[in-house]
Regions:
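Amphipathic, well-ordered alpha-helical segments in soluble domains
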Residues: 9, 13-16, 35, 42, ...
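A long, hydrophobic alpha-helical segment
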Residues: 11-30
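Short, hydrophobic, well-ordered secondary-structure elements
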Residues: 29-50, 129
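A broadly used, surface-exposed interaction patch
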Residues: 49-113
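Polyanionic, low-complexity intrinsically disordered segments
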Residues: 133-313
Length: 313
């Protein structure tokens, strides 16, 4: 059962996030993402709890053991499990789920790790605001309760109108729809900004390869440079020889570890990755769905992180 106080608090928090977005400043954008992410998690959790009250507590309802496990995982602290549960219930699409998980990741890296994401932070925050507003418009509130002790903030009143103890579901749906409409007015540059940041990332790695190859940009030399970079970084570890044994290295054969890694070992990235990365960039640029574009961006950044760091070192 959802309390109207809970819904008005969500409205209040989203309006506060909107104030931050309008300022278009990286620090305010970071604060906005934290607020929006919290609204998303609270909204999902409240709806999951309302289902659990029925499906786990009433003995007359038959629920499979797999469904129980899934529901109990969603009741836990993990954000991803809550959002994935929403897909199984038809609350959101798989695309929206992937986008929310990706955006939650940006929230965590910005808040916990201090990563700035300055080139894309504003468009990410707007996209998250829009996504959460869309979710709340279609939010199946189910049964809800009001109380004479409810306190409706001035921020929430901007969307709900005259103070009342009998706000209907239609009031809240209209309020969240208004926020969704405002998110459209804020603009949508997510695909463009993601592509720009991804392009800069690729060009940085391309420059690193050119530096290692001493500006000899023949394919063979660039392939060698990628292998050399990984070999160099690996051998800086004081336990390199011990770890190399697991890779197939045998010191008794008389070959230096560095030479063996450079000449004989088959690295996971053994060729110049830049052409393939540029193909992925073109694929992102061609996307019409911001959520699919975000998934492609996040996948690229995660999958190429290790080799990019190696080339940078």
């Amino acid at each position: 059962m959802i309390e109207t106080q809970f819904l008005t608090d969500l409205l209040d928090q989203l309006d506060l996030a909107l104030d931050q977005l309008i300022l278009n400043d990286r620090n305010h954008d970071r604060f906005a993402i934290i607020l929006i992410d919290n609204v998303a998690e609270l909204a999902f959790h409240a709806r999951i709890v309302s289902i659990a009250d029925i499906e786990l507590d009433r003995k007359t309802i038959v629920i499979s053991s797999d469904s129980q496990k899934q529901l109990r995982r969603a009741l836990g602290r993990g954000f991803d499990q809550k959002v994935r549960f929403g897909v199984t219930k038809g609350w959101i699409s798989q695309e929206q789920c992937d986008a929310m998980i990706g955006l939650h990741g940006f929230r965590n890296s910005s808040y916990h790790q201090g990563l700035r994401h300055e080139e894309i932070l504003h468009s990410l925050a707007i996209a998250y605001f829009r996504l959460v507003s869309e979710f709340l418009v279609s939010y199946n509130f189910g049964s809800y309760v009001t109380s004479s002790s409810d306190r409706v903030s001035y921020r929430a009143l901007k969307y709900l109108g005259t103070p009342s103890y009998s706000y209907s579901i239609e009031h809240f749906t209209a309020a969240f729809r208004r926020l969704e409409e405002i998110s459209v007015i804020l603009g949508d540059t997510l695909i463009r900004d993601l592509a720009s940041d991804m392009s800069s990332t690729i060009e940085s790695s391309d420059s690193s390869i050119s530096f290692i190859s001493c500006s000899d940009d023949t394919p063979e030399r660039r392939d060698w440079s990628v292998v050399f970079a990984q070999t160099f970084v690996f051998t800086q570890d004081e336990d390199a020889e011990e770890k190399a044994v697991d890779l197939g290295y045998n010191k008794a054969e008389g070959k230096r570890l560095f030479d063996w890694l450079l000449e004989d070992y088959r690295w996971q990235v053994s060729r110049d990755p830049i052409p393939g990365w540029r193909n992925r960039l073109n694929s992102l640029r061609a996307e019409v769905s911001p959520w699919r574009a975000l998934k492609k961006y996040c996948d690229f950044m995660e999958q190429t992180n290790d080799i990019r760091l190696t080339l940078y070192e």
